[in-house]
Swiss-Prot record:
Catalytic activity field: 3-O-(alpha-L-fucosyl)-L-threonyl-[EGF-like domain protein] + UDP-N-acetyl-alpha-D-glucosamine = 3-O-(N-acetyl-beta-D-glucosaminyl-(1->3)-alpha-L-fucosyl)-L-threonyl-[EGF-like domain protein] + UDP + H(+); 3-O-(alpha-L-fucosyl)-L-seryl-[EGF-like domain protein] + UDP-N-acetyl-alpha-D-glucosamine = 3-O-(N-acetyl-beta-D-glucosaminyl-(1->3)-alpha-L-fucosyl)-L-seryl-[EGF-like domain protein] + UDP + H(+)
Membrane topology, record value: Single-pass type II membrane protein
Annotated localization: Golgi apparatus; Golgi apparatus membrane
InterPro entries: Fringe, Fringe-like_glycosylTrfase
Keywords (A to Z) from UniProt: Developmental protein, Disease variant, Disulfide bond, Dwarfism, Glycoprotein, Glycosyltransferase, Golgi apparatus, Manganese, Membrane, Metal-binding, Signal-anchor, Transferase, Transmembrane, Transmembrane helix
Protein known as: Beta-1,3-N-acetylglucosaminyltransferase lunatic fringe
One example of a Gene Ontology biological process annotation: T cell differentiation
GO molecular function terms attached to this record: metal ion binding; O-fucosylpeptide 3-beta-N-acetylglucosaminyltransferase activity
Cofactor: Mn(2+); Co(2+)
EC number(s) per entry: 2.4.1.222
Organismal lineage: Eukaryota, Metazoa, Chordata, Craniata, Vertebrata
Length: 379
């Protein structure tokens, strides 16, 4: 009897020892990915499985009773929630999501010489509009800025070497506008630069904000960023043959607020934009230059417009732009809105009569070290 019990005990011990050896020698399971760790942490915060999150809080939050079930203080909860959100962040290589909701790729280094800013103007506005831009924002980075105009101007040429005579009509017609845009596009492609940005001669460009925005996207990707002036896609009639047209819908960034296109996308636009093709493409829909850009990008290439509230035109109420957020805006403008003077409301060293566009005051607000800005200015 004792001998039989001893034999059973020895067999049990041998079996247990063998099981331990197998467990120790087996490969350990791989550690969970950071995102999975984050999701597990969030699930632990949410309490037992099946607890429903409170409306509006998303998957990361549950009912208050469940949230505090496994933590003992608010500071511990927020610490764990912050760590969980960080761990459950975008997967490797994915784009961070900024405050405006648009996913953006990781930043790439960007210098002023990487950006080609085309300023469209006409000779009759050289003194009235262009001189103001040369005095303010263009003076900070002349190497970035290329002025496209329809008339010779020796004074302008002496002030900046980047003047392009387009040989286009001075009329404000869709054909003349498309002619200038075609020249802008071709010059950008020839430049080899990473980014093409178009603005009008009534725009103020905040160069630091522009570089910050563009550095959020890789220039090799398809990027078309700007601000639409309509609350819905525009409808055009696309001519597909001599006697046949069809409706087409697309979004476009208004040229009056400015827009930017990456080199990667600009190269794909070449069949419809390079040489004389841009003019032909514009005739297919019989719309102006900025609409034609949107048509090529959205309707023909299938690349969606990235809407940004940092671009502004005179078609919106500019007095709603907060002075405290001026440093974040990419473009500003001035003009008339609903039959009233339309400009950014900003206090500064210059009166409205002396500075109706408010561009000088804006410039001194952004660059107080400018020699002609009064040192005692209060904003």
């Amino acid at each position: 009897m004792l001998k039989r019990c001893g034999r059973r005990l020895l067999l049990a011990l041998a079996g247990a020892l063998l099981a331990c050896l197998l467990v120790l020698t087996a490969d350990p399971p791989p550690p969970p990915l950071p995102a999975e760790r984050g999701r597990r942490a969030l699930r632990s915060l949410a309490g037992p499985a099946g607890a429903a999150p409170a409306p509006g809080l998303g998957a990361a939050a549950a009912a208050p009773g469940a949230l505090v079930r496994d933590v003992h203080s608010l500071s511990e909860y927020f610490s764990l929630l912050t760590r969980a959100r960080r761990d459950a962040g975008p997967p490797p290589g994915a784009a961070p999501r900024p405050a405006d909701g648009h996913p953006r790729p990781l930043a790439e280094p960007l210098a002023p010489r990487d950006v080609f800013i085309a300023v469209k103007t006409t000779k009759k506005f050289h003194r009235a509009r262009l001189d103001l831009l040369l005095e303010t924002w263009i003076s900070r980075h002349k190497e970035m800025t290329f002025i496209f105009t329809d008339g010779e101007d020796e004074a302008l040429a002496r002030h900046t070497g980047n003047v392009v005579i387009t040989n286009c009509s001075a009329a404000h017609s869709r054909q003349a506008l498309s002619c200038k845009m075609a020249v802008e596009y071709d010059r950008f492609i020839e430049s080899g630069r990473k980014w093409f940005c178009h603005v009008d001669d009534d725009n103020y460009v905040n160069l630091r904000a522009l570089l910050r925005l563009l550095a959020s996207y890789p220039h090799t990707r398809d990027v078309y960023v700007g601000k639409p002036s309509l609350d819905r896609p525009i409808q055009a009639m696309e001519r597909v043959s001599e006697n046949k047209v069809r409706p087409v819908h697309f979004w476009f960034a208004t040229g009056g607020a400015g827009f930017c296109i990456s080199r990667g996308l600009a190269l794909k636009m070449s069949p419809w934009a390079s040489g004389g093709h841009f003019m032909n493409t514009a005739e297919r829909i019989r719309l102006p230059d900025d609409c034609t850009i949107g048509y090529i990008v959205e309707a023909l290439l299938g690349v969606p417009l990235i809407r940004s509230g940092l671009f502004h035109s005179h078609l919106e109420n500019l007095q709603q732009v907060p002075t405290s957020e001026l440093h974040e805006q990419v473009t500003l403008s001035y003009g008339m809105f609903e039959n009233k003077r339309n400009a950014v409301h900003v206090k500064g060293p210059f009166s409205v009569e002396a500075d109706p566009s408010r561009f000088r005051s804006i410039h001194c607000h952004l660059y107080p070290d400018t020699p002609w800005c009064p040192r005692t200015a209060i904003f």
